[in-house]
């Protein structure tokens, strides 16, 4: 999905871009703090802050949970996805643009609806059932594809920085589940 499509979806549920790191205390819409948990590992953040709107935080937890459930069904492996970016301010976007060719001034990360998940690094909580990075990447891609088809997220595969760029969608616009 293009940056324009991500931006249009993010505007529906996102926040106004923050003027600085303190302005998140005066928002018209709530944001929630994101921390490492059983569903995912939060990498050390340099160019973003650990906050998302509630819908994006819920989508991130669902991705992590589905990833771990799929691993279990396919023979096990105690791995978690690695989240590498969350909410950004205009200042952090400007700094990031000097290093990352994928970064743009109109970064949808500024709206609190978007996060990045690495497809090149996963967190192994134990080494009992080793899996290849390609296998883990494939499972993550399947989870993201399914959630995209359900209307829950938009996904962009980034190459320069090995990650999936994911934007949460408005729950009111998600596709109804088909009955079986």
Describe the residue ranges of each PLM region.
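Extracytoplasmic cell-surface/polysaccharide-interacting catalytic and binding patches
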Residues: 1-60, 64-71, 159, 167-180
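Glycine- and small hydrophobic-enriched segments that form the cores of compact globular domains
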Residues: 44, 76-77, 96-100
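Extracytoplasmic/periplasmic, Sec-exported soluble proteins
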Residues: 48-59, 88, 106-109, 128-135
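Acidic helix-start/capping segments at beta-turn-to-alpha-helix junctions
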Residues: 76-93
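Catalytic cores and adjacent binding grooves of peptidoglycan-active enzymes
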Residues: 104-180
């Amino acid at each position: 999905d293009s940056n324009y499509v991500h931006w249009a979806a993010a505007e529906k549920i996102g926040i106004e871009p923050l003027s600085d790191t303190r302005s998140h205390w005066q928002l018209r819409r709530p944001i929630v703090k994101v921390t490492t948990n059983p569903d995912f590992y939060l990498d050390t953040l340099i160019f973003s802050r650990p906050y998302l709107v509630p819908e994006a935080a819920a989508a991130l937890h669902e991705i992590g949970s589905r990833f771990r459930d799929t691993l279990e069904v396919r023979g096990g492996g105690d791995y978690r996805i690695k989240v590498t970016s969350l909410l950004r301010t205009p200042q952090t976007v400007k700094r990031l643009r000097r290093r990352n060719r994928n970064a743009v001034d109109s970064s949808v990360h500024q709206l609190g609806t978007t996060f990045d998940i690495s497809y090149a690094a996963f967190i192994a909580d134990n080494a009992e059932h080793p899996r290849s990075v390609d296998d883990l990447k494939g499972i993550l891609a399947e989870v993201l594809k399914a959630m995209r088809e359900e209307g829950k997220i938009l996904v962009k595969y980034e190459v320069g920085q090995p990650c999936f760029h994911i934007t949460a969608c408005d729950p009111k616009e998600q596709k109804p589940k088909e009955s079986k």
